[in-house]
């Protein structure tokens, strides 16, 4: 028997898709109030991992343990902080958070060598509990995405059936990514880590119409597609 056969586990590299929670306030009470207002009913999240983006606030003023507890109440499990705040390693350890480094720029020379994005086509329904990820390209779903299902793409997402679950476009930060949907009944929409839940019925001008979802000024907006 070889030495490797005696090992009880292997270590391999992996890429994980995480929501990014970009804080705009350091006041735990205000953040808690916003969570309550946005998710006063059932949260669309269930044990969903996310990272905390503290680039827009003073990280010294944050109650990290409190943030972990508050977001966990709504199914969002914070696993790390980015960019890593200097001198706060002890506070992160105490809250069970990992330092995830900074926002390093992409190496353009490497991008030139990367293959052109591919399109993943799914011709069957995506059912509750299933996740489909189009890594490095666009995703086309020719059927329905059920409630409790999740579709993710580094590029655009096109859904020719009903979207009743979650759709996350621009998963690697592509802010010009879009989501195109024939029938919008989504639990959650996300582009480049910025997300929005649909807690109310769509306006009459958008209901029962094919829609596109895009990012404008750090906000998710929906527009009807031309007839």
UniProtKB/Swiss-Prot annotation:
Q: Residues of the signal sequence?
A: none
Q: Does the keyword Cell division apply?
A: yes
Which terms under GO biological process does the entry name? Answer: cell morphogenesis; division septum assembly; regulation of cell division; regulation of cell septum assembly
| Keyword Cell division applies | yes
Superkingdom, according to UniProt?
Bacteria
SUPFAM superfamilies to which the protein is assigned, alphabetical: Cell-division inhibitor MinC, C-terminal domain
Keywords for this protein: Cell cycle, Cell division, Septation
The UniProt family comment states: Belongs to the MinC family.
The family database entries (HAMAP family) matched by this protein are listed as: MinC
Complexes and interactors: Interacts with MinD and FtsZ.
- Its job: Cell division inhibitor that blocks the formation of polar Z ring septums. Rapidly oscillates between the poles of the cell to destabilize FtsZ filaments that have formed before they mature into polar Z rings. Prevents FtsZ polymerization.
Q: What is this protein called?
A: Probable septum site-determining protein MinC
What species was this sequence derived from?
Laribacter hongkongensis (strain HLHK9)
């Amino acid at each position: 028997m070889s030495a490797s056969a005696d090992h009880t586990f292997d270590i391999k590299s992996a890429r994980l898709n995480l929501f990014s929670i970009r804080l705009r306030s350091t006041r735990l009470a205000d953040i808690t109030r916003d969570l309550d207002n946005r998710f006063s009913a059932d949260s669309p999240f269930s044990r969903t991992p996310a990272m905390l983006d503290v680039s827009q606030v003073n990280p010294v003023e944050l109650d990290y343990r409190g943030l972990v507890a508050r977001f966990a109440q709504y199914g969002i499990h914070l696993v790390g902080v980015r960019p890593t705040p200097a001198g706060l390693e002890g506070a992160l350890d105490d809250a069970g958070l990992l330092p995830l480094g900074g926002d390093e720029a992409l190496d353009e020379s490497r991008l030139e060598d990367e293959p052109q994005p591919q399109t993943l086509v799914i011709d069957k329904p995506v059912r509750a509990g299933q996740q489909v990820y189009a890594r490095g390209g666009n995703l086309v779903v020719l059927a329905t995405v059920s409630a409790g299902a999740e579709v993710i793409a580094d590029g655009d997402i096109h859904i020719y059936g009903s979207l009743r679950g979650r759709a996350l476009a621009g998963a690697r930060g592509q802010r010009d990514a879009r989501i195109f949907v024939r029938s919008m009944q989504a639990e959650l929409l996300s582009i480049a880590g910025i997300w929005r839940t649909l807690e109310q019925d769509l306006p009459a001008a958008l209901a029962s119409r094919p829609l596109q979802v895009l990012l404008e000024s750090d906000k998710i907006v929906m527009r009807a597609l031309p007839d």
